[in-house]
Every structure is written in C-alpha cells, then in structure tokens.
Amino acid sequence: TEKYPGPYQTEWEFLRDVLLRQGVPPQAVLKEDTASYTYENAIRSRQVTDAAGLEIRTAILCCQAYHGRRALMYYQLLYPHTRFLVCPAVTQGISRDNWHQTRRGAELVLGEMERCGSQFHEIMKKFYERE
C-alpha cells in the first residue's frame, strides 16, 4: 500500500515498520521472524522474551479477527501468567459481525473453530506428556 510500500521480506519486517511509523521506539520492538505458523510463533515469542529477561504481565495480541480465539489459546498456554488484550483486525472484509454472510467468511471461521479443537488438543496432549 501507499502507507507501507515495502518491500518486506517477512511479516515481522512489515509489522516493525508499522510500529516505528506509529512512534514505537526501535529498541522496544523485539525480533521474532522464524516462525511459520501460529503456535510456533507463540513458542518463539516466549523464547525471545525469556532471552531478554522480560516478565510479560500484560500483552496486546494483534491478529486477524477470525483468528483471534486460536491465537489467544496458544499464547495463554505459553504465557500462563499474562493478561492478554486481543486486538482483532478486520482483514479480507471478514469481521465478527459479518463472517457468516459469505461462503469465504464461514469457511475461515469454521476452519478456525475446527483447528481450535484438533490442533489444540494435540498440543495439549504433548504438553501434558512433558510434565
């Protein structure tokens, strides 16, 4: 877009640019650009904050509106003592108010619901096996 022309090699590069243009100091932006899926992003984020010696008490979780529940579940698992504020972004024209009005919206939301059960169930099994 005109506001963020890029080019960006990673999602992290784009989001860093957004934050810097909004006045966030560069030293406040932590780098995690190795994850390729949501749960891995939560894992890597935890590694980054632990390596920096940060205790995260409250965090804002920015994600696509239809993806918020699953992202929150993963981050709550990795940061059990953190209070999360979910900031859903309407993307692809899909919001909490209109998702059911199009086939694409319904497919995305129902697919997320399915993954909340199937993926999270598998993650929890592995999580408890480690204990």
Can you annotate each of these PLM segments?
Residues 1-101:
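A structural signal for short, hydrophobic/glycine-enriched beta-strand patches
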Residues 96-131:
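A structured, mid-to-C-terminal "fold-capping" secondary-structure block
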